Amino acid sequence: MKLSQKEKAALKAAFRSMTPGEKAEYILTYYKWPILLGLLALAVLCSGVYGRLTEKEPVLYVGFVNTVVGEDMKSSLTSGYLSDSGLDLRRREVYTYEDLYLTDDADTLSHEYAYASRMKVLAAVNAGKLDVVFTNREGYDLLSRAGYLLDLGGLLRENDPQSAQRLEPLLTENAVVISDNSLEVLLNEAEAADTVTENAQNGLPLSGFPLFREAGFDGEVYLTVIANSSRRDSVTSYIRYLCG
């Protein structure tokens, strides 16, 4: 019901005559829910603004497959690169996928974990959110055969000819499956397996470079680049930083 001017004036006078404690009790009694809803809306707004202000833009997406790195090495591979490139660490990041495990050994005790890692890699590749992968030989072979990897010789020749002259002799060739009839064999539509492969220079062994000599890796670790990466300029500068 709408109050008259006289009633409004009476309420104002009564409110002014209250003690501070009575005023607080009156406000909480009649305006508790509007106040709570207003505070909730303000908290949501502040949270959104804070998230936008502190959100970091990924410069690169990097995965570690069958490879564990310590905190110091991880820092060198992420914030070290950003600092060397003159990028603001508060606004940029190298996003990492850690603890990925790939194997084609169906008898391994970690088969379910390997399957989950394979799905995670597939999702990241399909989303365009995986650029560089550090991996051991087994992971390198699997990624190469699946056709995930970019030819590094071509990448370097196109984007950094000077580094190409130095690094191309060090690149490792691996098989890439062009076609196979394993499904047809499984369905009894073909009698013999027929797999067609070609070789590509899609791996760079890292143990000989200063940054990795004291890394303590168990065996050789290879740098590989995902074929559908859209950040090839950043990938090239990253390789130049790692192998400098």
Where in this protein do the model-derived segments appear?
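Short, well-ordered beta-strand elements
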Residues: 58-68, 93-97
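Short extracytoplasmic/periplasmic juxtamembrane "stem" segments immediately C-terminal to an N-terminal membrane anchor
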Residues: 62-82
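Extracytoplasmic "Venus flytrap"/periplasmic binding protein-like
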Residues: 110, 116-190
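Extracytoplasmic/periplasmic/luminal assembly and interaction segments
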Residues: 78-132, 137
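Short amphipathic alpha-helical coupling segments at ligand-binding clamshell hinges
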Residues: 230-241
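Hydrophobic membrane-insertion alpha-helices, especially the h-region
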Residues: 30-52
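Short, membrane-interfacial amphipathic segments enriched in basic
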Residues: 9-22
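A bilobed periplasmic-binding-protein/Venus flytrap-type ligand-binding module shared by bacterial periplasmic
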Residues: 211-231
